[in-house]
Design a protein with these regions (language model features):
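A cross-family phosphate/adenosyl-ligand binding-site feature
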Residues: 1-187
Length: 187
């Protein structure tokens, strides 16, 4: 567990390909860069990572509980205050909900509130395919997030888009680019 010399990084993962590598691809390298990490997952991502044992590994690594459900109003906050949020991977559904202000689970509530908090950086990596990107609402969703000050890690140089089910097998998410965007957002 890190002492968090750089502060607390709120890592939020959604049910998209690559979430299974959240620990090794994003959390461990963030700790190596000096962050204390607090992990929150969407309900489906939480279910997936509990089944694989990753939630337990993340909790052991970070020393904090992994959140995927809301707490009761009288319960203590399980995570310290966050200095920057990073949403990776962000499914097309999560991007659409964040862009339109829908906050129907713990992960969306935390990030949605962060987008409206002055001075709190938010970085989002949309893990989408070419069909998602051609949807008529997609560009507006990205523009809406950017207008809210969100640092969007997106483009062919970062994540080339493929048609559904045509991406090369074993393709890793651009974790280094995501962490570099966190560094840039927190300077």
């Amino acid at each position: 567990m890190s002492s968090g010399k750089r502060g607390v990084l709120g890592v939020v993962g959604s049910a998209a390909g690559g979430v299974e590598a959240l620990r090794t691809g994003l959390v461990e390298p963030a700790i190596d860069r000096g962050w204390q990490v607090a992990v929150t997952l969407t309900p489906t991502a939480g279910h997936w990572l509990r089944l694989s044992g990753e939630v337990e590994r993340l909790e052991k690594l970070t020393g904090l509980p992994v959140r995927d459900e809301p707490r009761l109003p009288g319960d203590a906050r399980p995570h310290p205050p966050v200095d920057c949020y990073v949403v990776a991977p962000a499914s097309a559904n999560m991007v659409a909900k964040l862009a339109t202000g829908l906050m129907d689970n713990q992960a969306l509530t935390q990030v949605g509130e962060a987008i409206g908090t002055l001075g709190l950086p938010v970085v989002v990596f949309p893990r989408v395919n070419a069909a998602h990107a051609r949807h008529p609402a997609w560009r507006r969703h990205l523009d809406s997030l950017k207008a809210g000050g969100v640092h969007v890690v997106y483009g062919p140089d970062v994540w080339p888009l493929y048609e559904p089910r045509e991406a090369p097998a074993g393709r890793e998410l651009p974790w280094v680019a995501v962490l570099d965007a966190v560094d840039e957002a927190t300077r």
